[in-house]
Amino acid sequence: MPQPLKQSLDQSKRLREAEKHLRELENLVDSNLEEEKLKPQLSMGEDVQSPGKGEPLHPNVRAPLSHVVRAATIDLPRLGNKLPAKHHLGKLSGLYQMKGCTFNPEWKVPDISDTHFDLQVVNECPSRNWKYLTPAKFWPKSISYFPVQAGVKAKYPDNVMQHEAIVGKYLNRLYEAGILYKRISKHLVTFKGKPYNWELQYLVKQHQVPDGTTTSKINGRAENRRRRAPAKSISRPHDSERDCNMVGQISNNRSSIRPCANNGGGKHSSTTGRLACWGGKTIGTDQSYSSRDASASVDSRGRSKSSRGFSSISRRKATGNHHHCSYVTNSVEATTRGRSTPGKQVFTRDSSSLPESRASRACDKDSSPQEEENAWYLRGNTSWPNRITGKLFLVDKNSRNTTEARLVVDFSQFSKGKNAMRFPRYWSPNLSTLRRILPVGMPRISLDLSQAFYHLPLNPASSSRLAVSDGQHVYYFRKAPMGVGLSPFLLHLFTTALGSEIARRFNVWTFTYMDDFLLCHPNARHLNSISHAVCSFLQELGIRINFDKTTPSPVNDIRFLGYQIDQKFMKIEESRWIELRTVIKKIKIGAWYDWKCIQRFVGHLNFVLPFTKGNIEMLKPMYAAITNKVNFSFSSAYRTLLYKLTMGVCKLAIRPKSSVPLPRVATDATPTHGAISHITGGSAVFAFSKVRDIHIQELLMVCLAKIMIKPRCILSDSTFVCHKRYQTLPWHFAMLAKQLLSPIQLYFVPSKYNPADGPSRHRPPDWTALTYTPLSKAIYIPHRLCGT
């Protein structure tokens, strides 16, 4: 219970007790651990051992945490040098010493479906976010290009060819699903699936004009792209010589084979018209050529290496695939035989059944495995480089599924180095925010998006900056890849817009984080029906749900963002605590551990730290090792402290009641004296043993007031004290101060209104005029999550 100060406190027994505590706090401050004990001792070697080497870990679980903390300040951990040290701490290892991936020649490429959301979602889910997503844009400041042959990382030196083959299958699967563009030439790519509205203006559209030339309608503008005006001739009936001469002219013309998008019209544009491809069908012939030949013949700029004769082209094609030669000869025969009257085209297929404004490669009957239906040609407002910007390799899909492969895309050049970009920030809830927004006592359902990043379309010009290759073909990401720092921001915008509409339309509490949706409602039966309606609503818009990770029915206990959440509390799974205790037990006292290994260990401790009675200052010695990149050695007492933290497990309440207690205790300090004042009129003045910085003297008095009176809140005129950021203080004093002041609120009061300002200057306290405010920053919560 709070013990109010009395007027005669300075004459009582408790004054001597308070002075004793003050001297202990001053000793903690004066033993400057940060400069003497934790600075990098570069002269230390492996023979330096901690005093508690070999002692078994038997922490006294019943001992107060404060006793364990004080023991850790006596038996200190040590920093070492940069010599090689242990890279393994239990099951943890240094980030660069992680277990290497094992190549699996039986890796299967996972099923990847076409994720094409309907643009009607812009009207169904009104949000300003869509202007950033339809399409998304990616403009790096500068780009480093790599050769196509370096497209697959040499992750598995013994299985290079097999690795590249599986990567090629994976990329082809992504291309078939409409996620990648495939390069045809410098100005032309092809893709599959349904085109977006902004792609329609770049699709290749060919139209026949009366004089026989071909025009390409690009960017909504039709223009004649002939390089040389053909000599017009008068049509004569039964002109057999013209037909015969046409074959010779075609074979000798340097632009004999014309692409689907003809930028430079040749002398014999009727041939060009017959080679045009529309809607997955062939116009003018039944024969086709493969995608590799298309890269040579579909270039619309006339810059293809076609200076050789038609016969040489035919021979070159025949060496690669035997059916290419048959295509060329048959197409020529169709050109010469299929002309019944000059100036007209005779199609061997019904062109009325072909959809408009569509181009695809023609396919031969003998090459049915290479047939590409539902393919489109696109010439964007950019050039498509025959180089790459990212590299690829394969790993296991996860630790539980080693039969399927996962494609890892390395676009790290855009996040570090000379090409580093500053990606936009977005709201992400921390643990404190999550506690305050989750509704209490409601059943919950979790939904998970399937292939979430592949829902986000990119502008074609941006796609050309995200080039990858399997060593054979060059692909460009048509949808957002996972290896770019912009993708999480885009996904946040995407799911936030959907979550807002779901909450409004279905009257259900909705929270989204990346690809996870959390739905809550007081009525479990109603929530169950809502979840089915939400899934149907999303699927109608082309948004895919991963039902394997979706909660089938409302539950009270759910795992979300790594936390176990029930109706009233949040906690950490017991299995995680057991793993962490096992790691701590395997710490060898006095052994030197590499800082990368310590870095991983600190990451695990940080995740569970809010669920313990500890604070971040307890990890400061390990942070010092990480910052200075030196080895770290655990002491026996420090290992016991870490183990003690994992034993005092607690659960955090959802929607904690926020109370604003009235301040009854105030503190103040000068370089030589400190004072504590109570609202009842009692006060006490203390003399410091030495002059220190004023912010340290202020913190000493606040800690003393907490030890002696145990108030719910304290007034102080020091912003340093009120912000509770004590990283610059000596480690053991900062750790104790953080431990003492974390449970209570500190209010800032201006010095002229501070009731303890008078006693510290030998004047009576004044509680009549009191103005104070908390300096803690209010937690930001989105407006749509505030009203529940």
Swiss-Prot record:
Q: Where is this region: RnaseH domain (RH)?
A: 656-788
Superkingdom is: Viruses
Keyword Magnesium listed? The answer is yes
Mention one GO biological process in which this protein takes part, according to its record: DNA replication
Composition bias type Polar residues, residue spans: 327-355
Which segments show compositional bias classed as Basic and acidic residues?
358-368
Taxonomy, top ranks, is: Viruses, Riboviria, Pararnavirae, Artverviricota, Revtraviricetes
Q: Which gene encodes it?
A: P
Terminal protein domain (TP): annotated segments: 1-200
Q: Where is this region: Polymerase/reverse transcriptase domain (RT)?
A: 366-655
Bias (Basic residues) occurs at 314-325
Task performed by this protein: Multifunctional enzyme that converts the viral RNA genome into dsDNA in viral cytoplasmic capsids. This enzyme displays a DNA polymerase activity that can copy either DNA or RNA templates, and a ribonuclease H (RNase H) activity that cleaves the RNA strand of RNA-DNA heteroduplexes in a partially processive 3'- to 5'-endonucleasic mode. Neo-synthesized pregenomic RNA (pgRNA) are encapsidated together with the P protein, and reverse-transcribed inside the nucleocapsid.
Q: What is this protein called?
A: Protein P
